[in-house]
Amino acid sequence: DIAHSGKIEELERFAAIWTQVFPGDRRSDGGVVEKLFVTGNHDLAASWVKGDDEYLSRVLFAHKDNPGKVWKRLFNEEFLPIWKKEVKGYTFVGSQWPTGTDDPPVEEWFREHAEELRGSKPFFYLQHAHPKGTCGDGKISYDDGRSTRALAAFGNAVAITGHSHQTLTDESSVWQGSFTSINAGCLRGGGNDRSRKIYDSCWPTYNKKLRLLNRMNPIDTLEGGCCLLIDVFDASLRIRRWSLAYDQPLGEDWCVSLPARTGGAFDNALQRSSSVGPEFSTSAKLEVVVCSVAPKAVAGPALHNKPCVWLKIPRPRTVKSGSRVYDFEISVMEGGKQLLQRTVLANGFNVPEAVADRVSNCLFGRDELPPTGACRFVVRPRNAFGVAGRE
């Protein structure tokens, strides 16, 4: 996204900064800098902005013919559903956010331009959402599959996309199959998009009713702001993932061979099968605190002013590069029976490992546990692929 609330003034601020840094679209040495901009849902799908026609015409970027007029005024170029630009001999293709009424014809466009794009030399495709079924996709996607189908014919295609805010500590951020797909991370905050489905401890949901069900406060995703620095070669990419909050690498560089192929180093299924889960040290201890009132610093709305059991989980060690702890699977056992299971993100999951040595938390309401209190907690540390170490 360029804007946050879909307002023209937000794009104006962005354009002013661009002009300040690159006056006349040129670097300090006079070299031309190309604008490789694509819009996201916060630019073109800002349905939360309400008002009459006069107000929306003045304020909202997506209203009627505003995209074309505003884009031309701010960036001195046409607002095209799909554009193609050349930078130092490499082709870049960008596609705008689909609105449902004027969607970019991605599949048709790639069929028409197939001959000029085919080959071993990489070209780059930019859109807001991850292509369906690729990097950071998890069990949800905001792409309907059209970009995946369009790019599948090009082993030299490299898609760079976002929308998910997925942290770049996630080792599945690079996906290779019929093409290459890369999670761009998020400048504002690296989080975990899958958290909406399986975690209590990440993003606060925008749904006020669902927010009341959160047992734990969200982990600070602003601390996880990140970006990529990519060195481009004809047969490979060197990808550096960078923490903006700490101004240091988020992990080891990724060296990606091109063209893509199934079964390569970034085949996510093979990465998972060969990865090793993190391990607790032999001296690690789980601290269990019985609270008459849930701790305010940790508890979410569902446990405010209620009794709970607070688990304080020590950080496990990384056994193999690329397999740092990402989350914890906690089971409540009574005798040999599992009563319930919860998954929480590791505190520090989205920051450089050098500053991630932190205690993680998990809360259970007392009403979730046996009345006698006779139960056992089993904690398994997992990496970003869901591979667990020993309990």
Predicted regions and their residues:
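Outer-membrane beta-barrel translocator/channel fold
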Residues: D137-Y142
